[in-house]
Design a protein with these regions (language model features):
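N-terminal first-folded block
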Residues: 3-48
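Hydrophobic, membrane-inserted alpha-helices
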Residues: 50-58
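Extended, low-polarity transmembrane helix blocks
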Residues: 1-20, 63-124
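Membrane-interface junctions
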Residues: 40-41, 60-63
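Active-site-proximal flexible loops/turns
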Residues: 27, 59, 90
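Short hydrophobic/aromatic segments of transmembrane alpha-helices and their interfaces
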Residues: 48-50, 103
């Protein structure tokens, strides 16, 4: 895949992850509601936020891109799971925005991970 497209994907995923941090760390009511519903408030909210911060940072460095993409894939798979099991696709009348953002971020992180597969030490 084109290196420029992959760079744009990495930046896009990192921005998506980073922009959600203020909601998690500052205790936005929607974020508190989500993590209360799944039984992970407040420690899950802070923990997931911290993991998303690490994943977004790893995406910015070429050597660690695969780790950031792998973490993001796992984090978004968890978000998708909770949307499909406990939260529902639409949370607090958001029209499914959070769910669809999670699915899109998951798909893009899979593309990044696939493109970086040769850099993964335990696969190569």
């Amino acid at each position: 895949m084109n290196k420029t497209v992959l760079l744009i994907f990495r930046i896009l995923v990192a921005i998506i992850l980073l922009q959600t941090l203020r909601y998690k760390f500052l205790g936005h009511p929607d974020s508190v509601y989500i993590f209360s519903t799944i039984g992970m408030e407040p420690y899950g909210r802070y923990g997931i936020g911290f993991l998303e911060l690490i994943a977004s940072g790893l995406l910015f460095f070429k050597r660690s891109t695969w780790m950031g993409a792998l973490m993001t894939t796992g984090l978004m798979a968890g978000a998708i799971f909770f949307h499909l099991s406990q939260l529902g696709i639409e949370v607090k009348n958001d029209g499914g925005t959070l769910f669809y953002m999670a699915v899109g971020t998951w798909a893009i992180s899979l593309i990044i991970l696939w493109s970086e597969r040769k850099n993964i030490p335990f696969i190569n």
